[in-house]
Regions:
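Helix N-cap / beta->alpha transition motif
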Residues: 5-9, 94-96, 212
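Short acidic/polar capping segments at secondary-structure boundaries
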Residues: 28, 32, 44-45, 97-99
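Extended, solvent-exposed, turn-rich assembly/linker loops in the middle of proteins
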Residues: 49-132
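Sequence/fold signature of self-assembling virion shell proteins
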Residues: 12, 19, 60-68, 109-238
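Short loop/turn segments at secondary-structure transitions that flank enzyme active sites
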Residues: 33, 37, 98-100, 206
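Intrinsically disordered or highly flexible coil/loop and linker segments, enriched in small
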Residues: 36-40, 87, 134
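Short, glycine/acidic-rich hinge or "gate" loops at secondary-structure transitions
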Residues: 38-51
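Long, hydrophobic/aromatic-enriched structural stretches that serve as scaffold segments
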Residues: 1-38
Length: 238
């Protein structure tokens, strides 16, 4: 559950409908963020993947280094998935810190023709990696200490997810599902503090499951914390 308080004096001074709409948006967006966080924690945990479906980059293989090979790493990841399920990954989630490195990487920039902007865009990345759905994980949440942190870390997740359509069945291979109770999403209100404060509450019941880890691949450690630009020719971090 997530709740948003509205003081009765605040409600009297504001336009009631707009204030309640704002409160509803806040709590529903909060639930969506909680869902994304639960999914991100699940798919960024190396323990949920077989050895053949994950890699932890280190040293000069990290994408800070100009001589690293992101295209080769992605190709190997795609091969690992296709060997397990006979399907290539069609979805990729890139953490924000990993995206900052990829879009400036010399190898990928070298694939852009001279008459184009020398910055790798998301559409170009889809062409280079031959993956139709690429999403940059930019969401931020507040941890238990009140610090704002990224939900998606310096990781890249590849997955095969069946496209929605009439031909899709429950037997199709898929990386993960969220099981949600029917009609579980509910918005209601209640009062506290002697009826002086009204709360708009959103409730949802769901559980994400990593049902087909063999249909996914986790690339961790994209960012080398010991990177030294003085030792690198062609600094990716410029």
């Amino acid at each position: 559950d997530l709740s948003y308080p509205i003081d009765y004096r605040e409600e009297q001074e504001a336009e009631k409908v707009k204030l309640q709409l704002h409160a509803t948006n806040v709590v529903t967006n909060g639930l969506q963020l909680e869902h994304e966080k639960a999914c991100a924690d699940l798919v960024q945990n190396p323990n949920n993947f077989a050895n053949e479906n994950k890699i932890i980059l280190s040293g000069s293989s990290c994408f800070n280094w100009s001589k690293s090979d992101p295209q080769g790493v992605i190709d190997d990841a795609k091969d690992a998935v296709s060997q397990k399920i006979a399907q290539d990954p069609n979805t990729m989630v890139i953490g924000q810190s990993a995206w900052k490195l990829l879009k400036k990487h010399p190898q990928l920039k070298g694939l852009i023709s001279d008459n184009q902007n020398k910055l790798v865009t998301l559409n170009l990345l889809k062409e280079i990696f031959e993956i139709e759905n690429i999403v940059i994980g930019k969401s931020i949440f507040s941890d238990k200490d009140g610090n704002f942190v990224r939900i998606w870390q310096d990781n890249i997740i590849l997955a095969y997810v069946p496209n929605l359509g009439n031909s899709r069945t429950e037997y199709d291979p898929s990386f993960a599902y969220t099981v949600r109770k029917k009609d579980a999403l509910n918005i209601d209100e209640y009062t506290k503090e002697g009826n002086k404060v009204k709360y708009i509450r959103a409730t949802d019941i769901y559980t994400p499951f990593l049902v087909g880890a063999e249909a996914g691949y986790l690339i961790s450690g994209v960012n080398d914390p010991s990177y030294d630009s003085a030792k690198d020719k062609g600094d990716v971090n410029e």
